[in-house]
UniProtKB/Swiss-Prot annotation:
The protein's name in its UniProt record: Protein SlyX homolog
Gene that encodes it: slyX
Taxonomic classification: Bacteria, Pseudomonadati, Pseudomonadota, Betaproteobacteria, Neisseriales
Organism listed in the record: Chromobacterium violaceum (strain ATCC 12472 / DSM 30191 / JCM 1249 / CCUG 213 / NBRC 12614 / NCIMB 9131 / NCTC 9757 / MK)
Any Pfam family the entry gives: SlyX
Disulfide bonds: none
HAMAP family from the UniProt entry: SlyX (MF_00715)
Amino acid sequence: MAGMNTENENRVEALEVRLAFQDELLDALNATVARQQKEIDLLQQQIRLLYQQFRNAQPDDAPGGSLRDDIPPHY
């Protein structure tokens, strides 16, 4: 019987160690996801700003028309 208790204690200890490592890993992964979300938010903001700057620099009613309407010289 004593051998059975020691075996169970060893198994419980091993599970507790695994749980501690998994908790640490989960915290690290959560920090990574939070950092990446901040980077994504910043990149989206920069893309919106660049898009607005592009739209302001290339109005469709500008003299010469839109670049989308130009035909390449080889046609």
